[in-house]
Amino acid sequence: MKHAVASLAMLFAVALMAGCATQEGPATTRPDESLVNTYWKLTALDGESPDVVDGQREPHFVLHADPARVMGSTGCNRMMGNYRLEASTLRFMALSSTRMACPHGASIERRFLAALNATTAWRIEGERLWLLDAQHETLARFEAVHLQ
């Protein structure tokens, strides 16, 4: 009888502890951002974080759907052009920019435009975008920014 009471007490204690445990739901991941109509802020170029220069805009772009236009900033100048998107391929075409003289940021601007011109593919995971070259090597990485 003592054995039965001890077993019953132990079973009650285990049930009580199980009831107090927190349950975790399934892991939630953020859905992938849309490539089009999203503000993409440059976070890495040639594997390095770009320097943001005081008084200049951050390098970024937005792909607009109709017509298929790209607009953004190189960090120094405004840029614009066209793009063609087919499944996982992306090509920027006829890119142009304003020609303001900026004492800082010319190197980033040149490399940013070169990366856009070399882009052939893209990949999005959550709020991050990678622009890839023909060998699927990363040219630039971006982060989605939600404007209020």
Feature map (PLM): residue ranges:
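Lipid interaction determinants
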Residues: 2-9, 18-148
